[in-house]
Amino acid sequence: LANNLGNLLSRVATAVGKKCDGVGPRPRPDSPLAAAAIEALEETTARWGDVQPSRALEATWQLIRATNAYLENNEPWKAEPGPLVDAVMGDALEALRIVAILASPAVPTTAQAVWERIGLDGLVADQRLPHAAAWGGYPGGVAVTKGEPLFPRRQV
């Protein structure tokens, strides 16, 4: 599961760096990812409320998988910079913002690292469900940084 989040963050940050001059675009209000984000928010919130952290994380990781599939379908790395790439990358950044909020209770340090790399200020732990994780909160116009791997591979 960790690889999925780390790979998603790396892919998005790399594409934003190359195709959007390192500045995160705003998400689309009518993004195809919005439905997956709403579903993840509802399920994750319910599972945290039931004190089922593993199921809460599984619901959060569904959004990561949906975002990876969305990127595979749209292939922004193959497109020329412009409105399509901006839309796809804005949507992916919004999904990462929501993932950071939803995962924060279980993996606070990782969630904060995602939060900062996608250009957001403050503490992800200060965000309150469900309102903070509603679709459309990513501001756009902020610097996105790739940084070191989120989960470095260990040599054994």
Where are the regions that the model predicts?
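Long, charged, mostly alpha-helical binding arms that flank functional sites
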Residues: 1-84
